[in-house]
């Protein structure tokens, strides 16, 4: 049985918090799921694309600062806060309602290490006061991940926010030839671009400024070590990466 815990219309979207079979979801217009949690283990990441995106923590080992563009239910923010509590996280989200829903229904913690900036995520001005080791790009509207991060000028701004050795990890709904076209745009700006497709309706893009990234050297050991402390199969996620 499906229970509607919250329902509202704002910014032209029909926003709901739905609970069914022990899974709570934040969704818009009855077709886009922004976040999902298992009520028996609310701190676990259960969305395959978000699990894959967390490989960024392996690639950016030792990260001290993480930027999230888009909050949703805050599942990735909460996950990082639990397993990497010393990392400073900055989150941009334009809707105070979404922030409130993340706190009430998805248990987003309040912590000095989590800074939420109420602002349109496509505006990099308020977040440019510092650099970041890792940037998660997960922006979405009623049609899916928005095309903003296909625009070269926007990617250039984000690239300028990265620390040396930093990575950008992005959610994309493209696959096949459409995804390859998007990846070529990224390749214009980044020395290394990897991707994984077939994660439900999502693909994930990984981009680095570093010329020499050897995924077979060092990273498998890091992934195996991290998987002992964190309930994610990082070695499988690493082996799934494809280069363009």
Predicted regions and their residues:
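C-terminal substrate-binding/active-site "lid" region of AdoMet-derived donor-dependent transferases
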Residues: 152-214
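The AdoMet/dcAdoMet-binding core of the Class I SAM-like
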Residues: 44-161
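A generic structural signal for alpha->beta connector loops
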Residues: 86-88, 111-113, 165, 190-192, ...
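SAM/dcSAM-binding transferase cores
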Residues: 1-21, 25, 33-40, 57, ...
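A short, flexible beta-alpha/helix-coil linker loop
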Residues: 32-35, 140-143, 168
């Amino acid at each position: 049985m499906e229970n509607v815990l919250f329902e509202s219309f704002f910014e032209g979207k029909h926003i709901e918090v739905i609970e069914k079979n022990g899974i709570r979801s934040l969704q818009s217009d009855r077709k886009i799921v922004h976040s999902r949690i298992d009520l028996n283990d609310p701190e676990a990441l259960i969305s395959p694309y978000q699990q894959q995106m967390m490989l960024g923590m392996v690639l950016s080992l030792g990260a001290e600062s993480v930027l999230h563009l888009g909050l949703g239910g805050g599942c990735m923010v909460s996950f990082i806060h639990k397993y990497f509590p010393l990392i400073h996280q900055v989150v941009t989200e334009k809707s105070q309602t979404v922030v409130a829903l993340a706190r009430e229904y998805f248990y987003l913690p309040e912590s000095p290490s989590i800074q939420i900036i109420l602002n349109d995520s496509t505006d990099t001005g308020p977040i440019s006061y510092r650099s970041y080791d890792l940037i998660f790009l997960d922006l979405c509207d009623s049609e899916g991940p928005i095309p903003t991060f296909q625009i070269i000028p926007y990617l250039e701004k984000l690239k300028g926010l990265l620390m040396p050795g930093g990575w950008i990890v992005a959610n994309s709904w493209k696959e096949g030839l459409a995804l390859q076209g998007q990846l070529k745009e990224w390749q214009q700006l980044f020395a290394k671009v990897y991707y994984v497709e077939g994660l439900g309706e999502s693909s994930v893009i990984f981009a680095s400024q570093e010329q020499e990234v050897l995924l077979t050297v060092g990273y498998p050991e890091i992934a195996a070590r991290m998987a002992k402390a964190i309930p994610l199969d990082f070695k499988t996620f690493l082996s799934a990466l494809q280069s363009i």
